Structures are given as C-alpha cells and as structure tokens.
C-alpha cells in the first residue's frame, strides 16, 4: 500500500482530497510490481493512476458510486462552471480502461454527466454477517431509550443531510402522529444538517430519538434487529449500503420507487416502495403498522433476496479483475487517452525531479551546516583553551606577586631588627 498526502477540503466536500503529484508516492508506485490499478475517485486518484499507468504497464479500473452532478451543483454557481467541471470528470473517467458502477441507476447518472463508454454493474457488499443478534445484545444497545413494547420502531442510519430524504421522513411522521398512530423514530448518524434536522423534528417530541453516530458494528446490528422498519427515502444514493445492512438483519426498508437504493426490490415482497413525497410515505406506514406480521415477513424476504456479503462482492471483483487483465494483455482497450497519460506522467516526473533537486539542495545545506558547526566548535574550543591558559598565567603572576611581597616584607623586618641593635 502506498499512501499519498492530502489537502484538507472538509469544509467544501466533507472529506480530504488527495494530492496526485506527490513525488514520494510516484517513486513508491513506480518501484512496485503493479498488476492492476483501481480508482474510486474521478479526480485526484484517477489522475495519479493515469500518470503511472504506462510506467507500471497495468490496466486502470474506475468505480463510480457517487452522484457527482449533485455535488458539483452544490459547490459551483453558474451553469458554465458546472458543465465545465462535469466535462473534466467525464473525460477523466473515459480515460480508464474499464468503468464499474454500483447500480444501474449509477450508470444512468454517469451517462447524464457526459460519459459515453461502456460500464459493468458491480454491486457493493456489506461487512455485516447475515442473521440477528441475541435479545441480550439488543437490550444492552437500546436499554437507555424509550422504546415501549408493541410500538413500531422506525430506523434511519446515515449522514444527517437533508438530501438523504430526511424531510420526507419527518413530514410523514407528523402526518402519522396527527392520525393518532404511535411510533418511535430513531436516527443514527451525524452530519452538517444535524442541528437543523433536530430542530425540524421538535414537534414530534419524545417520539423522535437521535443517537448520534455509532461506530461499533455490533451495536449497530442490534439497532437493525430492534427496529421494525428501515426508512430510506433517498434518491441521492447510488447503492444504499445501509439497505443491505438492514437486510442482513431481516429488516425491510421503505424506499423511493425508481431510486438506485430500490433496485431489485419488489413492493410488498422484499421491501416497500413509495413515491418521493411525505404523503405517500405516511400512507404506506399507516397501512404497514396495522399488519406487524407483514413487516417481519417482508424483512425475512429482504434478507434472502437482497443481502450481499462483502466476501461475495470481493469474489466477483477478483473474477472481473482477471478478465480486465486478460483484455489488457490482448490489447482490447482503447488507447486514445494515452498521450494525456504521458503529459500527466511528465508532470509527475517534473515534480520528482524538483523533489530530487530540493533533496540535493537540502543535502548541500546540511553539509554546509555541519561544516559551519564544526568550524564554530573549533573556534569555541580554541577560545576555551586560551581562556584556561590565560587564567593559569594570571594565577601564576598573582602567586609571584604574593611571594615577592612576602619576601620583601621579611627582608624589611630583618633590616629593622639589625637597625634596632645598633641604635
């Protein structure tokens, strides 16, 4: 593994952005035996991979799993800027040898930003094992919260961002509350909109619970097992891993019909589908709450039909990697973007050369500092030796003066004694 430095862009994007022209990273990667390059970022990581692709002689795979047109629209003002940014993204993705998407909807979104090539649908798996945790584990995780028996528990897990469909959830629950249906709604996660979401949920009172982020996977599993329904009305997500995490615990999800998260879900069989509005969700929840046995049955079907383990997903990826490397060896990939790869590689080489010059300069400066330090130490030693010699001679001179005064005094006293005898 070769790590490379990053730039703090959390205020803009919520995460760090890598710096693709790190000389040290380029040197490390060029020295390693690389069979295949796989990027999950259409900008920095892909630029880094392209800059070394010809040097390491390996194919480049890219996975698209975020609706970047939504992010670009939020970050950039002005249609021209947005279109230019999306063009750069699509061009960079098109330069990869093979493109993977995490859902058919993600592929359609990729097409909408200007990508015209082929792609492979490679679904993500989840690291949660299939099956429920013990009742003791559920009690330990949820005991501090007001969850009365017999009252439906709805669950959301994810970032506290409005684009996750949180307003639809809260508005639907307000309609449900107005209709006299009791419930508990549990939100697990954190995010930039958390404070606004909690304020918007105030009219629901104690029926709405915010736990904050939970990083312990077993605790999260316990919450999935305690809930009766998983609410995820997001049209932003391209795959919805949390839907499959819920399915791992036999928990059915309420999803937007036609969304990426709802791919492969059949209404009333292994999940519940609604239109993208609060009224549709409220009507669906009102109907489901009257049939609690239906929630459990559909949840089991979700586990059987939707669950995909991380191990199975990795196995599929490894099998596809073999096909990619074979296609690369046989020259089946288009190389019309290779000249630009050369430019990127040249940029990396320039950065590497500059780094070497900097290192050389640092080395010369270090040797100069060492020589100056030795010279300064020599001067200090000679100064100390002179001081010691001067002190010794000064002390000898003082001793001589004291001895002379003593001798002179003795001779004077002897002379006065002789004079006293004659006088």
Predicted regions and their residues:
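Nucleotide-sugar donor phosphate/pyrophosphate-binding loop at the beta->alpha transition
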Residues: 59-61, 69-91
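Short alpha-helical donor nucleotide-sugar binding micro-motif in glycosyltransferases
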Residues: 93, 213, 222-227
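Conserved donor-binding/catalytic core segment of Leloir-type glycosyltransferases
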Residues: 100, 147-174
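Carbohydrate-associated surface elements
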Residues: 105, 125
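Nucleotide-activated donor-binding/catalytic signature segment of Leloir-type glycosyltransferases, i.e.
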Residues: 195-214
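Aromatic "clamp/platform" in nucleotide-sugar-dependent glycosyltransferases that forms part
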Residues: 235
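Short hydrophobic beta-strand element within catalytic cores of glycosyltransferases
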Residues: 252-256
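Conserved acidic donor-binding segment of nucleotide-sugar-dependent glycosyltransferases
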Residues: 267-268, 272-278, 287-292
């Amino acid at each position: 593994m070769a790590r490379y430095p990053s730039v703090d862009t959390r205020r803009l994007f919520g995460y760090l952005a890598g710096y693709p022209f790190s000389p040290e990273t380029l040197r490390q990667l060029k020295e390693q035996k690389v069979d295949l390059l796989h990027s999950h970022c259409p900008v920095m990581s892909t630029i880094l991979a392209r800059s070394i692709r010809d040097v390491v002689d390996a194919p480049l795979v890219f996975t698209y799993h975020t609706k970047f047109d939504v992010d670009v629209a939020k970050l950039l003002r002005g249609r021209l800027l947005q279109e230019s940014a999306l063009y750069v993204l699509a061009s960079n993705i098109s330069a990869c040898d093979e493109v993977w998407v995490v859902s058919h909807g993600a592929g359609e979104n990729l097409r909408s930003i200007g990508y015209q090539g082929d792609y492979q649908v490679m679904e993500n798996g989840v690291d949660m094992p299939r099956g429920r945790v013990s009742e003791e584990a559920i009690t330990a995780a949820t005991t501090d919260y007001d969850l009365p028996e017999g009252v439906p528990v709805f669950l959301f897990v994810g970032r506290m961002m409005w684009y996750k469909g949180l307003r639809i959830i809260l508005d639907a629950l307000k309609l449900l509350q107005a209709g006299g249906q009791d419930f508990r709604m549990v939100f697990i996660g954190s995010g930039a909109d958390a404070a606004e979401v909690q304020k918007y949920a105030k009219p629901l009172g104690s029926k709405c619970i915010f736990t904050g982020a939970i990083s312990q996977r077993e605790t999260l599993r316990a919450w999935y097992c305690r809930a009766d329904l998983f609410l995820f009305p997001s049209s932003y997500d391209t795959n919805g891993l949390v839907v499959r995490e819920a399915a791992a615990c036999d928990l059915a999800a309420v999803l937007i019909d036609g969304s990426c998260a709802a791919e492969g879900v059949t209404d009333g069989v292994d999940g519940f589908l609604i239109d993208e509005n609060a009224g549709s969700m409220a009507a669906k929840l009102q109907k489901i709450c009257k049939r609690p046995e239906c929630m459990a049955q559909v949840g089991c079907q979700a586990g059987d039909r939707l669950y995909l383990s991380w191990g199975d997903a990795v196995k599929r990826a490894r099998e596809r990697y073999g096909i990619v490397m074979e296609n690369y060896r046989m020259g089946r990939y288009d190389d019309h973007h290779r000249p630009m790869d050369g430019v990127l590689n040249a940029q990396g080489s320039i950065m590497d050369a500059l780094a070497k010059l900097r290192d050389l300069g640092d080395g010369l400066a270090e040797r100069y500092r060492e020589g100056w330090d030795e010279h300064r130490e020599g001067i200090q030693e000679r100064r100390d030796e002179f001081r010691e010699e001067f002190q010794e001679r000064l002390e000898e001179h003082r001793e001589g003066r004291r001895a002379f005064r003593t001798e002179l005094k003795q001779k004077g006293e002897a002379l006065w004694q002789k004079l006293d005898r004659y006088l």
